Amino acid sequence: MKKITALMLVLCMVFSLVACGGSAQQAAEKVEEKAEEAAAAVEEKVEEAVEAAEPAAESDVKVAMITDYGDITDQSFNQTTYEACKAFCEDKGLAFSYYKPASDADDARVASIELAIDDGYNVIVMPGYAFAGAIAATAPEYADVDFIALDVSSGDLGDDYVLPANLYCAVYQEELCGYMAGYAAVKLGYTKLGFLGGMAVPAVVRYGYGFVQGADAAAAELGVPVEIKYVYGNQFYGDADITAYMDTWYAAGTEIVFACGGGIYSSAAEAAVKVGGKVIGVDVDQAATIDGLYGEGLTVTSAMKGLAATVNTMLGKVVDGTFQGGMVENLGLVSAVPEENYVQIAGSTQFSDSFTRADYEALVADMFAGKITVSNDIDAEPAVTAVTVDYQGNIK
């Protein structure tokens, strides 16, 4: 019908040409030319309609996330990774599930990985250095499965371990967002700071040493004396002993504590609310969680890693066939725009006239441009010029 209509329109045009004095031969040539164009256009439309009507091929990508010793409600690594995987898979129409190991042990994590593979999942996502042993045991054995490990370094896997082509590991430059948090805290007017680390693993140490460097830089700019108390809880959760330790800090004048280590924030928050103190969150924006549990406005900022961004990037590469393993990628600043980076502080930061969002953006731009450098050395305490740091070892 569309072809007939098109031809009729063309004939009308031809008759108009003849009526205006055109020759019969010219008219015939015009008819043939216009008819061919109309037929081609109709054929193209039909092909487009057929393609649109055809169902998209079902992807064979099936994604499984394995939790570490926590759960998907931990408001930290597990939850962020789970939610990012789930959202990506729902958007792309991919099968997704998660598995929780029976215990905090390598053999339990191996069992969960193998169960997921037996269930048909061919992409395994794992958050945290605790997976190193399980990865070493499984990745080489399942060459047709893609493994994505977040915050797992070469050192975690072993100096002699050769990464197989199906294993991608991401680590983060925590010293950079730690620096941002320390700088922001001092610029916002806090001069008695604390750092409560979970365990002294490389990522936590980088956070802490970056925090010290950032606070030192801000103190030097402002010309104010700043004190920092620094300790590790030797665990990634809060308890009565750590809360009591934090009580002594806040009672002695500590104004704000960077609680760096999963659920260990609970001890800092419990102590802070008793005296009107503040806390800084870690890994993800913890303001909603901490403030929801302990009181509005308690969380000044959070030093964050781009876990969700990494998940989206790597799963996207799996889907489009560009996934490349056999590497440990060190993720940090990729832009002068804060939100585009793999390390940053939270959008919920309590900016003020003394440290505005524009000030933060300028800080990130200078860091990206190399005007500000931050040491990632974890073997020696960072050199400082304007702050006093009291390193107190481990609480336990």
Residue ranges, per PLM feature:
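Membrane-proximal amphipathic alpha-helices
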Residues: 21-23
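C-terminal motif of bacterial Sec signal peptides marking the signal peptidase cleavage site
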Residues: 16-19
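A residue-level marker of the well-folded mature domains of exported/periplasmic proteins
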Residues: 25-396
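Positively charged n-region of N-terminal signal peptides that target proteins for export
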Residues: 1-9
